[in-house]
Amino acid sequence: MSEQNSTEMTFQIQRIYTKDISFEAPNAPQVFQKDWQPEVKLDLDTASTQLAEGVYEVVLRVTVTAALGEETAFLCEVQQGGIFSIDGIEGTQMAHCLGAYCPNILFPYARECITSLVSRGTFPQLNLAPVNFDALFMNYLQQQAGEGAEQHQDA
């Protein structure tokens, strides 16, 4: 039997937590008097850190900005963290796990937190659509491959 078959991939969620929260409504209360037709912008970012052998922290940063014309109605940022035990994978598989699989787990928690903050700011309910982190990760890999090819051509 080969060594590859004897090593199983293990994955466990140790903890999911809110690392940082920020909510700003810089133009309140005047913004409440305006017709509510906001332009909503969503920004996502992930970061991962190895804490110990086989233990990783993944942080998903979600920033939502709602603007009415040139005025910011609200700005909400949540950093949702998770500690995961991951063994038996490496390389691109590990990068996919940390950059797509773990953020997929964290996003519903961040989304709920943002929805709650926006509601507490007395703005209309904000329902963020699910995010396909697998597609975002594949785009990232393609972008990195393209940049690597450009650097290779320049040499």
Curated annotation (Swiss-Prot):
This protein's UniProt keywords: Chaperone, Cytoplasm, Protein transport, Translocation, Transport
BP-aspect Gene Ontology terms: protein folding; protein tetramerization; protein transport
InterPro entries: SecB (IPR003708), SecB-like_sf (IPR035958)
Cysteine-cysteine disulfides: none
Cell compartments where the protein resides: Cytoplasm
UniProt GO molecular function: unfolded protein binding
One Pfam assignment: SecB
Cellular component terms (Gene Ontology): cytoplasm
Top-rank lineage group of the source organism: Bacteria
SUPFAM superfamilies for this protein: SecB-like
Keyword Transport included in the entry's annotation: yes
Coarse class of the protein's main subcellular location: cytoplasm
Quaternary context: Homotetramer, a dimer of dimers. One homotetramer interacts with 1 SecA dimer.
UniProt function note: One of the proteins required for the normal export of preproteins out of the cell cytoplasm. It is a molecular chaperone that binds to a subset of precursor proteins, maintaining them in a translocation-competent state. It also specifically binds to its receptor SecA.
Family, as annotated: Belongs to the SecB family.
Name of this chain's protein: Protein-export protein SecB
Source species: Klebsiella pneumoniae subsp. pneumoniae (strain ATCC 700721 / MGH 78578)
Organism ancestry: Bacteria, Pseudomonadati, Pseudomonadota, Gammaproteobacteria, Enterobacterales
